[in-house]
Amino acid sequence: MVQPELTQSVGYGIVVGLGLGFAALMIFVSWSLKKFNNENQTSEHFNTASHSVRTGLVASAVVSSWTWASTLLTSAQKTYQYGVSGAFWYASGACVQILLFTVLAIELKRKAPNAHTFLEVVRARCGPIAHGVFLVFAYITNILVMAMLLCGGSATISSVTGMNTVAVCFLLPVGVIIYTMFGGIKATFLTDYIHTVIILVILIMFSLATYSADKKIGSPGKLYDMLKEAGDAHPVAGNAQGSYLTMRSQEGAIFFIINLAGNFGTVFVDNGYWQKAIAANPASALPGYILGGLAWFAIPWLAATTMGLVALGLENKPYFPTYPNRMSDLEVSEGLVLPYAAIALMGRAGANATLLLVFMAVTSAASAELIAVSSIFTYDIYKQYVRPRATGKELLYTGHASLIVFGFAMSGFATGLYYGQVSMGYLYLLMGVLVCPAVVPATCVMLFSRVSTIAVTVSPVLGIISSIITWLVVARAEGGKTLTIETTGANNPMLAGNVVGLLSPALYILILSIIFPEKYDFNRLLATFAMHFSSEEDEIQQTKKLNRASVISKVAALIITAAFIILWPWPMYGTGYIFSKRFFTGWVVVGLIWIFFTVFAVGIFPLWEGRNDIYQVVSNMAASIFGRKVNDIVEDEGVVVETISIGSGSKEKVNFEKKDIESV
């Protein structure tokens, strides 16, 4: 039994204190934006941020939403198991989905610019039955992602501080629920930014401690020597020469395919990513998603290349938490490679940094899931089927209630998984089996006019039946005719289930579209979710920009995807190249350079891009403090904004009707 490095009081201080602190900060920020920047918290703004978010914040939000606890913990786990290939297979296998999703984000902006959720688009094109099918898949995705966040976060926090795991499961969502309620998706974007910056600072600290400052390692060359010794002591089955320093890893390649397939589901079917596309300014969707995808790659790659390999290098040292034993399979599956490596590397400081790192990763991604669930319930269930004429305030309160219920329901579900010994690693591999069957149909809804309604409706159902049967049959065949957590969680059953889940719906769609042919006119979709422009010229210009962005997104996404999943890794896999010390040093240096690019892209650039808004809020706040009254009167039926020119003191009153707001 490994003794916790920190006390329970430290854990409660972070989980409760910092969570409530963030909630208080976002309440203050939301109030400031309302009072000094004329941002009214209507249901529209709560769920879509009035379609106004710029490139930098979109990129930051994409990075933060995709930086789960598993991004840091599972990537380090796979590197510990398979060596340097594990970090790359995780990063590349989960990066390309964001880049390819850029295509769908632009198509959503072109064809349904005023939608609140992707499911609204499904209903408008394919009817209520298809809407119900995709509603189920969307909720399965949100439930799995939230469960994984809570399972991974609670296991790590409990191991580092000794906190009761059940208490962590219930306390982690509290602060997130509060600040998401008060700020909506705009608060999610802003906290995403803060969380991302903190995560990057901690990762850079770990990297510098490993490769430059720490006497335990101190350089890439010394870590290389340690990894050579580790490979000699316990070679990796399926790796070239049993080495940790090669991309030729049989089990690593299997994980790559599982990772690649499964993560299509958690991006393309998660309403949270569609929400960010909806909230983005039309001109910001393309650069925001591409910049976010490229920036995100460095996080798991460098985190795992550093901490996963540090665990291998220091595991035989007396100060490693499990010494003299290696980590158990359960500890590895629970994602404890990174925290144990941090403790061995930096002691109590490493434990504190890990606690903060995991807290930030869990809460930032959880806020996106809460908003996604809230939006679906508000617009796709309540307004669609319960109260079609619901007022803005009623929709806002409904959204608040739904995210509270979902947050605490997931705490209970995560607790059940904990007692059932279902780990974060198991859930991560299982995702694709359950949610990938909706990926191809969702893509077809936005891209192809000749896919029939029956094909879109039926193919996900047939796909999930096929994937579950395949998964369980392979598990039973390879596991001695018994189905357990161990046998169903093995690589081969998960590989089979994920691949069938992703690809079989494509076959079903083709067959059903041939049997039941149909051609859909996307102009009908545009008419349903049209944006209102001040002039016809503005509309023409916007259409031209989005058409151009559509072409660019397709070309850019395909080129970058090919580089990440084919051109870079497979030649190294095919040759079975064993890294030299010089090559390994260069590999690490590229990772460090890339993480500083990420800092610029999602840390510095959003501040520069939003400098005018920051100046306006600070100026108006200063004017209010020093006696110049700034009024912002907000009503449910409309908005009356009274502004003051700080230089001249002159007033201007602008009236907006409710219908004008809803059309923005």
UniProtKB/Swiss-Prot annotation:
Keywords: Membrane, Transmembrane, Transmembrane helix, Transport. GO terms for biological process: putrescine transport; spermidine transport; urea transmembrane transport; urea transport. The keyword S-adenosyl-L-methionine does not apply. It comes from the Eukaryota. It is found in: Membrane. Gene3D superfamilies: Sodium/glucose cotransporter (1.20.1730.10). The keyword Transmembrane helix applies. It is a multi-pass membrane protein. The chain crosses the membrane at residues 9-29, 56-76, 86-106, 132-152, 165-185, 189-209, 252-272, 290-310, 327-347, 353-373, 395-415, 428-448, 454-474, 496-516, 555-575, 587-607. Its main location: membrane. GO terms for molecular function: putrescine transmembrane transporter activity; spermidine transmembrane transporter activity; urea transmembrane transporter activity. GO terms for cellular component: plasma membrane. Belongs to the sodium:solute symporter (SSF) (TC 2.A.21) family. Involved in active transport of urea. This is Probable urea active transporter 1. It comes from Schizosaccharomyces pombe (strain 972 / ATCC 24843). The lineage of its organism: Eukaryota, Fungi, Dikarya, Ascomycota, Taphrinomycotina. The gene is dur3-1.
